[in-house]
Amino acid sequence: MRKIQYLFIALFICLEIQAQDKFNIRGVLPWHNFLSGPTSWNLSDYRIYLDECRKNGINFIGFHNYTGGGERYATYVEPMIKIEYKNILPQACFDNSMTARWGYLPMAVKDFAFDTGKIFQLPVGAEAFGNNGSITSHSSREHYEKAQSLMRDVLKMAHERGIRMAMGFEFGVIPPEYFSLNVAGDCFYWAGESNMIPNPKSQIAAEIHYAAIDDILNTYPDIDYIWMWLNEHSFMGVDVQKALRDKPFARAYQENQALFKEAADSSARFVGVWALEYMKLTYKHLKSKGSRAKLILGGWGGGHQLPSLLKGLDRALPQDIIFSCLNPDLGKSPQPDFLEEIARNRSVWAVPWLEGDHQLWHFQPRVNMMREQVKLAAEQNLDGVIAIHWRTEEPRFNFRTFARFASDKGADESVDQLYDRYLTEEFGEEAAKEMTPLLARMDREQIQWNVPSPEFYAYTPEWGLLDENNVRIRQELVSSGESLL
């Protein structure tokens, strides 16, 4: 009997050690907005994608839904989350080739250059390239219904593959239709440089926020996580002193500003208190609904964005709220060192970039970045790593590297060894021998970093220009390939 007990103890220890060898959360964050990403995917695309995720040990997928924004993003509302309030249904859609909310002009498939439109098989009556629900919808309600039906199927498919799912949006960013609800004497929002910023102490602002959360819970009842994001552009020029004339928010500011001692100035502390109030609203509302969904805080990783507020939010928020943050500089820089300190108090996830959206016309080798940033997350004792991306084909070596090190914290292959394996598997040993040194050098030195193709702006001929180093290494790659033919 005692031998059997020892056997079970040994087995338990082995299983625990094995679990520690991989991150608890090994995730992906396919980002909606550009047509090169999931905005244009259909259910068959998600099926292939999720199968590939499962094959590579991925156990989490998250989605971010835009609900408006500042400047030209004010009308950028996506239909995975429906914020319907006081019978107002905001306009929303997944973009397609006939919309113009990003840096391209509307174009029907039949007008694509060099008759390339002939390769596309469109649904009956559709003219645009994009998600089938988007290109066949004729009203905002239809856009919402088809998008949410698709994402419910994605949630089901993810769960069938052992993958948990998050749905999220940027708190305090609301569709433009709602700003007309301002009532005299009620401080619903503050005027910023480029948008109106809702006041979380306003009943209207709180109710609109609850409407978004309730829609997630009602539309996706089996959702595993609610992901709340701090807006990329943070606060967009609110006059702090004018805003503090609102007594309810002024009280919250006086009570909590000291938490944000790492913040650079009073404006940053103001954003910290504002974010804290929204996170408290979210946490309490989820509890009141009896939701089992876990709450995640997320945001962008620049110096004036989420990182400067994280320690203050860590001091104030319940420890069962997960913290996440996109790595800085479009992923070129690793996650901050202080995440290790926060990880002693709660679950923390780093978010490396498989690719940056400043170069989505170009090949972006980031095998070394994925290797180094995921290994750093292991050293920091972070609970999870999530990879943001748009495309699937171009960054596939980056993805495989991310998944490899996320699934085995002890992995230690070099960049050259990784490229040799990938190229051997795809093109054979001779090709790998010729091309591994070139791609590994291009990857480590990041010589392509300053080659621009930012899909969030309009196209210019500069997108196709390469400097001498980039021309030279591409010529070497072409010559190496031709020598093998």
Regions flagged by a language model, labelled:
Residues A184-D186, L244-K247:
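Flexible, surface-exposed loop regions and adjacent strand-edge segments
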Residues N59, I223-D224, D383-G384:
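Short acidic/polar active-site loop segments enriched in Thr and Asp
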Residues Q18-I204, P221, W349-P352, D357, ...:
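Feature activates predominantly on carbohydrate-active enzymes
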Residues M1-A19:
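Bacterial Sec-dependent N-terminal signal peptides
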Residues I48-D51, K146-K156, E160, E207, ...:
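Alpha-helical scaffolding segments of alpha/beta enzyme cores, especially the outer helices
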